[in-house]
Amino acid sequence: MEQIVGVRFKPAGKIYYFDGNDLELHLDDGVIVETSRGLEYGYVVTMPTEAEKDEENPMKPVIRRATIKDMAQLERNKAREKSAFDICLQKIEKFKVPMKLLRAEYTFDRNKIVFFFTSDGRVDFRELVKELAAVFHTRIELR
């Protein structure tokens, strides 16, 4: 048996399920989890429940409850996202890329910045990505 807990990364966002890792977790607790994007900070939104362990498709575990340091890191990331957004806008104008930037998100561990955008068609943003990677010294993803 494993303890399953629902975690949300954004208010009103999708709920993802993780192995509670035998941690004592409560609703609205901040937690650090491993996702396909890297380490992420989320909030517990469902009470932990017991479930059969699926050996073929194991759930990723909650790494730990969020600490005060983690909360401070989250706030620093939010501030950096604003700066990253502004810098990306400048680079979009510089390269005249036909896209509208929606938002920027750092992963919790700052291994990657994801820039969300819309465009009317396919966009060649290879030069933009190279420039952003040089500025931020981290992996860049455009979605």
Q: Where are each of the predicted segments found?
A:
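Acidic-enriched and Gly/Ser
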Residues: 1-143
